[in-house]
Amino acid sequence: MEEKQTLPDSRPPTPYHIWDGGEWLLPEEVRETARYWAAAEKWEEIKQKRHDNLRGGVYVDSVGKWFHSTDEARQQYTFMRTLSALPPDLMWKTMNGDFVNLTRPLLDELSLKLITDEQKDFANAERHKRLLEQSSEPWNYDYSGGWMEIYKEKS
């Protein structure tokens, strides 16, 4: 009578892992190769998270609103900073659909917040990179912590 084999209920952590009928194993002879490629793949995920976060909105305390931080929005903010004066009564649409009067002080606060949040997320990505490089199992590395908050629509 043949023994019934247990099938895995998940994908292997890396393409180098093999199923022994009860758990995923990583043969010693491919451990460093698997570790290298898993770390490289995870680092790409971290960079993508940083990229997405930078475009996920920025919260400006003085008006209590989220502003867009897409590449297009950043370009508009940069252009407006080159103007000697903003158009009077310039109404700007925020991420929740409300409009606010965009003044020079508000544009300054918004610009500073964009730079500050970007630098914090950059530092966080670098922190995760260092920890990832130290990990013996980079395929299991959790990089979800330490990121700046991004806009989430209320449902």
Ranges and model annotations:
Residues 1-155:
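A preference for well-ordered globular domain cores
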